[in-house]
From Swiss-Prot:
It is a multi-pass membrane protein. This is Glycerol-3-phosphate acyltransferase. The chain crosses the membrane at residues 5-25, 50-70, 72-92, 115-135, 140-160, 162-182. Its EC number is 2.3.1.275. Pathway: Lipid metabolism; phospholipid metabolism. Keywords: Cell membrane, Lipid biosynthesis, Lipid metabolism, Membrane, Phospholipid biosynthesis, Phospholipid metabolism, Transferase, Transmembrane, Transmembrane helix. The gene is plsY. It comes from Roseiflexus sp. (strain RS-1). It is found in: Cell membrane.
């Protein structure tokens, strides 16, 4: 009974953790309301766009930690891979459908990245590298995020085939990739029409 109670409690805590709008709070400390500034998105990329790199680094760190910490707790409690994945999913759901923002939120790139970095560093690190390289070349956050998601999906498939990744973790990664693509559908439309926002100034 206790593991079940602990699992349920951790899922709820993960959702609440994911719901904390770190990017919105950091931007507010800089005197900016993300909901009416930049792209209007409450994610870390919009913090960079509207508040600068220092604020972005804080927001990114917070958004990653709110995915990573519940996942680490689930692993520390010895939960099964499936239960750990459910906890990570709850954190991502909290970010995208925050109880503190009227069940709206960001696009789960940083929070999902924190979960994947905890579950499978060999999946997350190539994704982070792909994000950095793609963003440096294009200066378009959506392109970098979608590229990173694709690389993580491929890395998960390779590691699963090599027996180096639990199937539940691989399925989580692929589900996260699908969710990130879905949440970027408006960005994809703007990319097709050539109207997607590009960073003019990085630092």
């Amino acid at each position: 009974m206790m593991p079940t109670i602990a699992s349920i409690a951790l899922v709820l805590l993960a959702y609440l953790s994911g719901s904390i709008p770190f990017s919105l709070l950091v931007a507010r400390a800089w005197g900016v309301d993300l909901r009416v500034s930049g792209s209007g998105n409450v994610g870390a990329a919009n913090v960079w766009r509207t508040c600068g790199f220092s604020a972005f680094a804080l927001a990114m760190g917070g958004d990653m930690l709110k995915g990573a910490l519940p996942t680490i707790a689930a692993q520390a409690l010895g939960l099964s891979p499936l239960a750990v994945v459910i906890v990570g999913t709850a954190a991502m759901l909290g970010h995208t459908r925050s109880i503190f923002l009227g069940f709206r939120g960001g696009k789960a790139v940083a929070t999902g990245g924190g979960v994947v970095l905890t579950l499978a560093p060999l999946v997350a690190l190539p994704g982070l590298a792909a994000w950095a390289v793609t963003f440096g070349i294009t200066r378009i956050s959506a392109v970098a995020s979608l590229t990173a998601a694709a690389v993580c999906g491929i890395a998960a498939a390779v590691l699963l085939a090599l027996g180096m990744l639990p199937p539940a973790y691989a399925i989580f990664v692929w589900g996260a990739v699908a969710a990130i693509v879905f949440l970027h559908r408006s960005n994809i439309h703007r990319l097709r029409t050539g109207t997607e926002n590009r960073f003019e100034k990085l630092f």
